[in-house]
């Protein structure tokens, strides 16, 4: 790993005037100034999260409602509460026959005396809530032995 022993050409001494050194100094300063300007520009650009679409001033909407609106909303809430009467469980004498004291207490509290299943029975209020579980046959995509080879997009399956 030695260096080649070729001769270097003789260096030429050249007289430099002071004006060229001043020019060089001035160019260096300008370069530094432009670099710092670019750096500042880059920094300011990266700090701003996003630019608004329109340059016209925007009005900021406050998240809180105006006092008048809040009052209206409270009134509406009160009306809703008044409209819904508290459900009073009607217990007839027929329901009481053959029940223990605990079951009677439970009927007074909750409105039912025993825990029965309601599967398959129609109950009022349950008409609105329903779901159907439909199982469909599985559709498979053909990956191999297809026209166009592997690089072709797969067929759409809905």
Curated annotation (Swiss-Prot):
Residue ranges with Basic residues bias: 1-30, 42-62
UniProtKB keywords: mRNA processing, mRNA splicing, Nucleus
Compositionally biased intervals (Basic and acidic residues): 31-41, 69-86
Subcellular location: Nucleus
Main location: nucleus
Subunit structure and binding partners: Part of a tri-snRNP complex.
The name this protein goes by in its record: U4/U6.U5 small nuclear ribonucleoprotein 27 kDa protein
Organism listed in the record: Danio rerio (Zebrafish)
Gene: snrnp27
């Amino acid at each position: 790993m030695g260096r080649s022993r070729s001769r270097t050409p003789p260096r030429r001494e050249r007289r430099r005037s002071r004006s060229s050194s001043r020019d060089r100094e001035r160019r260096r300063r300008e370069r530094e100034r432009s670099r710092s300007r670019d750096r500042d520009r880059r920094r300011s650009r990266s700090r701003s999260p996003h630019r608004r679409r329109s340059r016209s001033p925007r009005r900021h909407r406050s998240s809180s409602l105006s006092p008048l609106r809040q009052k209206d909303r409270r009134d509406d809430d009160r009306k809703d509460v008044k409209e819904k009467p508290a459900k009073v469980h009607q217990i007839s004498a027929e329901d009481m026959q053959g029940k223990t004291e605990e079951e009677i207490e439970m009927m007074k509290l909750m409105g039912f005396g025993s825990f029965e299943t309601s599967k398959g029975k129609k109950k009022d209020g349950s008409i609105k809530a329903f779901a159907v579980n439909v199982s469909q046959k599985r559709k498979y995509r053909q990956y191999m032995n297809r026209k166009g080879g592997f690089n072709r997009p797969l067929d759409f399956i809905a």
